[in-house]
Amino acid sequence: AAKAVGHHMILSTQSSTAIEDVAEAHDAPIWFQLYPTNRWANTVAMLQRAEAAGCTAVCLTIDLPGGRNTETQSLLMREDDRDCSVCHKGQAKPIFKGLDMKGVMLNDSSLTWSVIGRMKEVTNMKVLIKGIEVGTDAALAVQHGADGIVVSNHGGRAVETERATIECLPEIVAAVNGRIPIIVDGGFRRGTDIYKALSLGATAV
């Protein structure tokens, strides 16, 4: 579908289709959305596989390890007794093929800004930081060598009561000051929404 309309594509770590198959079907460079694991060797293996598949950039997802409120989820009582672990367990994802995922978590809360440099040591892909919502973090991303940022709140589900991403743009644009591209996602439902984001300084939506 993306190929048919000439649209760019970013493939998630959680994709149910192998990155090589998606890249071949798209017939143009795609990007890889990385959920960093708490085992660096596995993260490196995923980066190198994505690059070998033809990905030209990686979007490092940083907005999930936050202290999100999970009280409602903890109270959930399922009436359906079917086991859905086949859908959600790590080994089921094609990107993990050949990797030892026992005990591996997809949210590495120990990440620091140094991860940008570490990633650049093991891949030639451009490194973008996905999940930036404030100007301070945007400036730090530039300072530590990020090639771009994605203003994102993960659809609003990672941290509750956050601002809409378009509301975050002005301070982020000011902090970046044209030094790297700024992409924004979330809540864009019509063309006029896109024009608003571009007029506020986003490079792309």
Language model regions located:
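Active-site cofactor/substrate anionic-group-binding motifs, chiefly glycine-
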Residues: A1-Q14
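Alpha/beta enzyme core
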Residues: A4, D21-A25, N38-V184, G191-V205
